[in-house]
Each structure stands twice: as structure tokens, then as C-alpha cells.
């Protein structure tokens, strides 16, 4: 029985309270016009306090220069028409009234990029008995954010979210930052709902009330509430997916210097393939950054630098190939160039080159060439010689003629000089004069061939020396440019204070 009485009393109380809220709402809305500014006199100014709570930094589209954020916009003001005495309404001190039924300050996002000035959801408005209004609607804003791409992808950006009244001037409403024990001059972050962005790290979140004194007070642009988001990019994605592969591919282009000097075609093929790969990386970066001519991104500078290095390597390969294929018939090497490129520079670079004037290594080649030539000339001599002479060669030996000839040749060989040998052969017998002339021709041709080949090898060695010098220069330039690029990006950090010259941190005091 007691339980039944308790339930009945609770139901009656709830019904009574609902009736009181309904009566209060009817009394408040009676003769209420939501289109009129809630002022008692024409000269009164309504103070509207604004606070921004960030729940998610969704993205920053560099191409469109648009910042997308998920926020809660808190607005507070007073409406004297919506005040009551709680004692008259069973102690009710707060009411929830649909925001579409009351006057709202027409404060919207000024720097939007999609034409949406309004909030996303019209939530209820909390109304206190003294007429204080509290409205906390959620919104997803796409605000304009001019992107500075000078140090991309090691950059930081200063984006702003600007609020101002669309129709009311400063003589009608006054925009202020919310005051709660102290003026909240920053963007609040809800620790329970906030989701960290994977690409951007928030460094500073200051807020300011901007007054443009160059405009009159009755201008709607006279006052603004600006919330700043100073964010630093996390460059790991671009380092792993663009910079590191590009550096490795470009380093391969330097390794073409280890190919032989005469392999110029293979050098050019490898370098041009690497150049095409670098062009693809440059195209990928161009799709990410805005189309601006005010500045060149750091990564574009670096990719252009690598392309210049690769093109230089291709040009060097063509020049070295031209030098390596030179012959004494078309070019002659001066003594100064020979001394510089084949002696001085290799000695400084500690290159182990065969001395150009070393005769012993050529001796086996000369002997092989001479033997081969003599055999060919001997075969030709046997074909041209009459058969009657071949039939009586043994008879000449019996007559002692061959013995005399061999003695004279032997005396020339004992002197161990080619001139004495030729002189002995000339006086040996008239029959072998033709053979002597053939031998002289073979020896002269062999010397010319060896000299030709030796000078041809000098051009090849010169190409090797140029390759080594260019390899060292390109390595130095490559590493210097790479280190300089990364250092420039490393030192481009967001400032310690949000505004230059202002030591205030614009954050909650701890």
C-alpha cells in the first residue's frame, strides 16, 4: 500500500513539474518575437561571448587550401524577455528551448570555402532564470587557410577560423571572448572526444578579438573573433614514400661512373631511366601542393637539384665517350694534357694507371704481331716465287751459297741491332732483297700499329681519369645538397610563441 502511494505521488509530482515547465514556456513565448534584438532601449548593446572547442582536426587540403575541423561553438548572451522568478514556477531555474524559437546572434564563419556560413545542427538553447542564454551547437567547418609551401614537407602552417556577425554592427552587438575566471584566449580541446591528426601536430591555439580601427563602428567588419591553429606537419610519410626512394634512385645514377669509360651508351641509358623516375616523383609532389608561383617547395627544389645532377651525369657520359673513342687519326694529345691527365691527376687521386711510356708490356704483343706478319709475308712470298727456284734451293745450299748468306746474317744478329740486321740482309744476296723489303715493311707497320694502339689507350685512360674526377665531384655535390636540404627542413620549426614580439603563450595557466 505504501509503495502504491509513493508511485502515485511521484507521478503527480512529475505531471505537476511538466505542467509548470509548459506553463513557463507558454508564458515566456507569449508575445515573444525571435526576429527582434533583445534590448530594452535602442542604444543598448548585446554582449555575445564566443568560445571554440576542438574535437577533431580532420584535414588540411593543401591543394584547395582548406582546413576542415570538427568543433563546438559556444555562445552566451542575455535575453531580458526570457527571464522569470523561479519561485513562481515551482523552483524551475533553467529551461531548454529549441534554438529555432529564440533570437540567435547571426555569428557565422567568415572565411569559409564552401559557402556554408551556418552551423550543422541547431541544438536546444539553455535558458537561465536571469535571462542568460547558452547555446552549444556542433559544426564541421571548412575554412580557408593560405598554405605557405616554401619548406614543404617540413613546413608549419598558421590557419585561422574567423567569426563575425553578418548583419549587426558593433553598435548593436559586441563580440567577446568567453570569460571563466580568466579570459579564454585559446581554443579549448575536449580530451575525451579529441582525435589526434596523423599528419599535423597542433603547436599553438590562440584566440584574439580583432578590432579594425580603420573602419567605422557601424561596419560589420569592424570586429571579429579569430581562433588560430598553428600546426606543424609530420613529415615521416613524405620521407619514407618520396624522399628516401628518390635519394636511393639518384645515388644509383652516381654509380654509373664505375662502368667502363667506353660504355657511354649504358651510362646514358641508366641515367635517363633514373631521370624518368625522378620526373614521376616530381609529378606526385605537384599533385599535392597548391598551384602557386609565390614560392617553390623545398622538396621540389631538392628533386630539381637531383634532376640537374642526373642530367650532368648524362652530359659527362657523352663527353667521356667522345674522349674514349678518339684516335690518333682525328685527334692528337698535347704534352700538357698528357702530363696533367695521365700523370698529375692520377697521382693525386691515387689511381693505378699503367705508365704510357712503359715498353716491356708491349714487347710480347710486338713479338706476336711480328711473328704473325712474318708468317703471312712468308706465305705470300712462297706463292709468288717461281717453282723452278723452289726446286733448286737444296742445290744452292750444296753450292755453299746459303752458307755465305747465313754467315752474313749471323754477323748482323751478333751486333744485336735491327739496322745491322737489315744492312747484313741487304748485302747477303740479291735474291732475298724482296724479302728484306717485306720485313722492313712489316716492322714499320708493327711499330705504327703499336704506337696507334698506345695513343688510343691514352685517350681511354684519360676518359677514366675524367670519370673519377666527376665521380668525386658529383658525390660531394650530392651529399652536400641532400644534407643542406634536410638541415633547412629540420630548422624550420613552429615558433615558441604564437605571435612575434608577444611573449604570451595563450594557453591555460597550469
Curated annotation (Swiss-Prot):
It holds the Pfam family Neur_chan_LBD. Keywords: Cell membrane, Disulfide bond, Glycoprotein, Ion channel, Ion transport, Ligand-gated ion channel, Membrane, Phosphoprotein, Postsynaptic cell membrane, Receptor, Signal, Synapse, Transmembrane, Transmembrane helix, Transport. It catalyses: K(+)(in) = K(+)(out); Na(+)(in) = Na(+)(out). SUPFAM superfamilies: Neurotransmitter-gated ion-channel transmembrane pore, Nicotinic receptor ligand binding domain-like. InterPro entries: Neur_chan_lig-bd, Neur_chan_lig-bd_sf, Neur_channel, Neuro-gated_channel_TM_sf, Neuro_actylchol_rec, Neurotrans-gated_channel_TM, Neurotransmitter_ion_chnl_CS, Nicotinic_acetylcholine_rcpt. Residues 324-468 are cytoplasmic. Its main location: membrane. The modification Phosphotyrosine is found at residue 381. The keyword Ligase does not apply. It is found in: Postsynaptic cell membrane; Cell membrane. One of its GO terms (biological process) is acetylcholine receptor signaling pathway. Pentamer of two alpha chains, and one each of the beta, delta, and gamma (in immature muscle) or epsilon (in mature muscle) chains. This is Acetylcholine receptor subunit gamma. It comes from Xenopus laevis (African clawed frog). The lineage of its organism: Eukaryota, Metazoa, Chordata, Craniata, Vertebrata.
Amino acid at each position: 500500500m505504501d509503495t502504491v502511494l509513493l508511485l502515485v505521488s511521484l507521478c503527480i509530482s512529475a505531471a505537476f513539474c511538466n505542467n509548470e515547465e509548459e506553463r513557463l514556456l507558454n508564458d515566456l513565448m507569449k508575445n515573444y518575437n525571435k526576429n527582434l534584438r533583445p534590448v530594452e532601449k535602442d542604444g543598448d548593446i548585446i554582449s555575445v561571448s564566443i568560445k571554440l572547442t576542438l574535437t577533431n582536426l580532420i584535414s588540411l587540403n593543401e591543394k584547395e587550401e582548406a582546413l576542415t575541423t570538427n568543433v563546438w561553438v559556444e555562445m552566451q548572451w542575455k535575453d531580458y524577455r526570457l527571464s522569470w522568478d523561479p519561485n513562481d514556477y515551482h523552483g524551475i531555474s533553467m529551461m531548454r528551448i529549441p534554438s529555432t524559437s529564440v533570437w540567435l546572434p547571426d555569428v557565422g564563419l567568415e572565411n569559409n570555402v564552401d559557402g556554408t556560413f551556418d552551423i550543422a545542427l541547431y541544438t536546444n538553447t539553455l535558458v537561465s532564470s536571469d535571462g542568460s542564454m547558452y547555446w552549444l551547437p556542433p559544426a564541421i567547418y571548412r575554412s580557408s587557410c593560405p598554405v605557405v609551401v616554401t619548406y614543404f614537407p617540413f613546413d608549419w602552417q598558421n590557419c585561422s577560423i574567423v567569426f563575425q556577425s553578418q548583419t549587426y554592427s558593433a553598435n548593436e552587438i559586441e563580440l567577446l571572448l568567453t570569460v571563466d575566471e580568466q579570459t579564454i584566449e585559446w581554443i579549448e580541446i575536449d580530451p575525451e572526444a579529441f582525435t589526434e591528426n596523423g599528419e599535423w601536430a597542433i603547436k599553438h591555439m590562440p584566440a584574439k578579438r580583432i578590432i579594425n580601427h580603420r573602419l567605422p563602428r557601424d561596419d560589420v567588419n569592424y570586429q571579429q573573433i579569430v581562433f588560430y591553429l598553428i600546426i606543424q606537419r609530420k613529415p615521416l610519410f613524405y620521407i619514407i614514400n618520396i624522399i628516401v626512394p628518390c635519394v636511393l634512385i639518384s645515388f644509383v645514377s652516381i654509380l654509373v661512373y664505375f662502368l667502363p669509360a667506353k660504355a657511354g651508351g649504358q651510362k646514358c641509358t641508366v641515367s635517363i631511366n633514373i631521370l624518368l623516375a625522378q620526373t614521376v616523383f616530381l609529378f606526385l609532389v605537384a599533385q599535392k601542393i597548391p598551384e602557386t608561383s609565390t614560392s617553390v617547395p623545398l622538396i621540389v627544389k631538392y628533386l630539381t637539384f637531383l634532376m640537374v645532377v642526373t642530367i650532368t651525369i648524362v652530359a659527362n657520359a657523352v663527353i667521356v665517350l667522345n674522349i674514349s673513342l678518339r684516335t690518333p687519326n682525328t685527334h692528337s694529345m698535347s704534352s700538357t694534357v698528357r702530363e696533367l691527365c695521365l700523370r698529375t691527376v692520377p697521382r693525386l687521386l691515387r689511381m693505378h694507371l699503367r705508365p704510357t711510356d712503359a715498353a716491356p708490356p708491349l714487347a710480347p704483343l710486338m713479338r706476336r704481331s711480328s711473328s704473325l706478319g712474318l708468317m703471312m709475308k712468308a706465305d705470300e712470298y712462297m706463292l709468288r716465287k717461281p717453282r723452278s727456284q723452289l726446286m733448286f734451293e737444296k742445290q744452292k745450299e750444296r753450292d755453299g751459297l746459303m752458307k755465305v748468306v747465313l754467315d752474313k746474317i749471323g754477323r748482323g744478329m751478333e751486333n744485336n741491332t735491327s739496322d745491322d740486321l737489315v744492312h747484313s740482309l741487304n748485302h747477303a744476296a740479291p735474291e732475298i732483297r724482296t724479302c728484306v723489303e717485306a720485313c722492313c715493311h712489316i716492322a714499320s707497320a708493327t711499330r705504327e700499329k703499336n704506337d696507334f694502339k698506345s695513343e688510343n689507350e691514352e685517350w681511354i685512360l684519360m676518359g677514366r681519369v675524367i670519370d673519377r674526377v666527376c665521380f668525386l665531384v658529383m658525390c660531394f655535390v650530392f651529399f652536400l645538397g641532400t644534407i643542406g636540404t634536410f638541415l633547412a627542413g629540420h630548422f624550420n620549426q613552429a615558433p615558441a610563441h604564437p605571435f612575434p614580439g608577444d611573449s604570451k603563450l595563450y594557453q591555460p595557466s597550469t
